[in-house]
Every structure is written in C-alpha cells, then in structure tokens.
Amino acid sequence: MEKFAAFARIAEIEFADVVLSTQDLGHKLRIYLIDKSFIDLSYTTELEIQRFTIHWERTHIDKSIYRLDNAPDRSWRKVETFPLHFHDKKYDKVGIPPFSVDENLLLKNIFRRFLRFARLQATA
C-alpha cells in the first residue's frame, strides 16, 4: 500500500467540500483546496518517534502559512507543547496548536483536526 493512500482518502472523502484533489509526490502528499491553496503532509516511517509536518501554503492568497509539526526545533523549545508546535500565519509566529492534539493521537486523527481547521479558515 502506498504511504499516503489512507491520508488521500481521508482528504478526498471526509473533506470533499474543500478538497479538490490530492497528489502523491513521493516524499509528501499534496492536497489542493478550493481556494487555490494547498496543504502538504510528510512524515517519517523509520524513526522510533514518528516526526511529521502538515504545512498549509497560502502565501499567494493572503501571505500566510500554517504549519503543525513535531520536529524538535530548539527555536521553539519554550512552546508549552514542545516539540509539537504550530506556525500561525507566519514562520516566526509559533505557539500551541489552535486545536487539541494529544501526544497519543494517531497521525490520521491529527491530520483530520488540521483539515477541520483549514476548512474553517478556507470557508470563512
């Protein structure tokens, strides 16, 4: 089974109202949204602790980006949920996610929560 197949199905079926299509780029899954923005999902499969990044690119629309990741970037070590952190509209505006993310949550469910967040923003 392809690495991103389950995530593509989640996006295309559960979020069909805002997702136009998905594209497996090999190292990441790209999700195209109705507002002409896109979300990239990438994650590791070889580390003991799964690392992931969910990045929503909107710079061409309103100069914003949103990104949730758990890379242990020391720059964000003061964030309460470190290593998990959320880039809110700008790369250097970082804090806790605007939705709950339990450290035991499966990546598929974290992905769903991010897509719900994107749905609210894209249709506002």
Residue spans of the language-model regions?
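Well-ordered alpha/beta subsegment
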Residues: 90-124
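Generic hydrophobic secondary-structure signal
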Residues: 31-33, 39-41, 52, 56, ...
